């Protein structure tokens, strides 16, 4: 069990190493942090910390750097979350207020999180709750193709192009009207049932073309938007420095895999709703992310939680990053709830 002085030394080492990227020596710690003990005493404390596995020394350097275990202790017992500044809070509110629909909210949120933290931000699409269909639009693109646009009460917009040879504007308008009369105000489950009944009632003349449209609408309704993850701030991977082949390239490749990102966020936020969680190094089960840290939180109503977070180097400013993730998660949750 480490006493308070050794915890103070570890905190000072983590703080200095994160800001300077250089190994930290005992003399510098005493001078910068007012530890009120001699460098010799600090060296003894550092020796204990190293023996316990909380710090190590790279190569022949006289300075020390934190290990993953050291960062873990720092996050769990030492770190104090830094509240966002008033300008940062105002910037979040202003940035979110301009959003026009759900897709825009997600894009703005993930970009904002990347900008605030200077890390790679990842965000799961909101989990659908009891949203209903607001409108269905059928747009003729050519003589043999149309665009189907489905707008939900949540603001989400799904669209898909379908081949529809031989259609005309009059029949398309009639089908659009009938489908909106059938679907508007229904939940996804209710809409699927209604569309299946709609198919049964089609006449022989309109059947084939309408069936093609309805089949596509059913496909759109079956898609779960919350299985999508949006990424922003990939250029921030330069924070890894020269570790391209060993760290950055595998992370870059993994960021392209939606299933991997969903698993990463899901495992990190499996605990209590609304809490900020931190996964450090090998605590991440996916190998490419074992050279990184993940700071994540949930957002949204308790019965439909989604996740967001940031990925960055293990040498991370945890207090600031955790505060930013918590603040953005709360803001986007409130913003979505207010509609």
Curated annotation (Swiss-Prot):
Q: Which InterPro entries match?
A: DeoR_HTH (IPR001034), GAF-like_dom_sf (IPR029016), HrcA (IPR002571), HrcA_C (IPR021153), WH-like_DNA-bd_sf (IPR036388), WH_DNA-bd_sf (IPR036390), WHTH_transcript_rep_HrcA_IDD (IPR023120)
Gene Ontology molecular-function annotations = DNA binding; DNA-binding transcription factor activity
Q: Which GO terms describe its biological process?
A: negative regulation of DNA-templated transcription
Q: Name one Pfam family in it.
A: HTH_DeoR
Q: Which domain of life is it from?
A: Bacteria
Q: Which UniProt keywords apply?
A: Repressor, Stress response, Transcription, Transcription regulation
Q: What does this protein do?
A: Negative regulator of class I heat shock genes (grpE-dnaK-dnaJ and groELS operons). Prevents heat-shock induction of these operons.
Q: What family does this belong to?
A: Belongs to the HrcA family.
UniProt-listed PANTHER family: HEAT-INDUCIBLE TRANSCRIPTION REPRESSOR HRCA
Please identify the protein, giving its name as recorded. Answer: Heat-inducible transcription repressor HrcA
Q: What species is given as this protein's source?
A: Cutibacterium acnes (strain DSM 16379 / KPA171202)
Q: Which gene encodes it?
A: hrcA
């Amino acid at each position: 069990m480490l006493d308070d002085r050794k915890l103070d030394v570890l905190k000072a080492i983590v703080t200095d190493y994160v800001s300077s990227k250089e190994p930290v020596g005992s003399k510098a710690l005493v001078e910068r942090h007012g530890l009120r003990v001699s460098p010799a005493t600090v060296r003894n404390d550092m020796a204990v910390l190293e023996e316990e596995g909380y710090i190590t020394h790279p190569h022949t350097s006289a300075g020390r750097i934190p290990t993953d275990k050291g960062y873990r202790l720092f996050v769990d017992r030492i770190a104090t979350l830094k509240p966002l500044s008033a300008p940062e809070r105002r910037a979040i509110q202003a940035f979110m207020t301009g959003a026009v629909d759900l897709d825009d909210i997600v894009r703005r949120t993930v970009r904002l999180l990347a900008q605030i933290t200077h890390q790679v931000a990842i965000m799961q699409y909101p989990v659908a709750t009891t949203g209903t269909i607001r409108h269905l639009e059928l747009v003729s693109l050519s003589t043999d193709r149309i665009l189907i646009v489905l707008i939900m009460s949540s603001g989400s917009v799904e669209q898909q192009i379908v081949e529809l040879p031989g259609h005309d504007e009059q029949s398309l308008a009639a089908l659009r009207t009938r489908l909106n009369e059938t679907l508007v105000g229904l939940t996804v489950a209710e809409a699927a049932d209604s569309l299946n009944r709609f198919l049964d009632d089609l006449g022989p003349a309109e059947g084939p073309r309408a069936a093609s449209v309805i089949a596509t609408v059913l496909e759109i309704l079956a898609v779960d938007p919350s299985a999508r993850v949006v990424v922003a701030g990939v250029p921030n991977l330069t924070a890894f420095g020269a570790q391209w082949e060993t760290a950055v390239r595998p992370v870059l490749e993994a960021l392209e895999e939606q299933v991997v990102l969903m698993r990463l966020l899901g495992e990190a936020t499996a605990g209590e709703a609304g809490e900020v969680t931190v996964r450090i190094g090998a605590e991440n089960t996916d190998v490419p992310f074992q050279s990184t840290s993940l700071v994540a939180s949930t957002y949204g109503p308790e019965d439909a939680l989604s996740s967001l977070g940031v990925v960055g180097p293990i040498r991370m400013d945890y207090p600031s990053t955790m505060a930013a993730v918590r603040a953005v998660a709360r803001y986007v949750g409130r913003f979505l709830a207010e509609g």
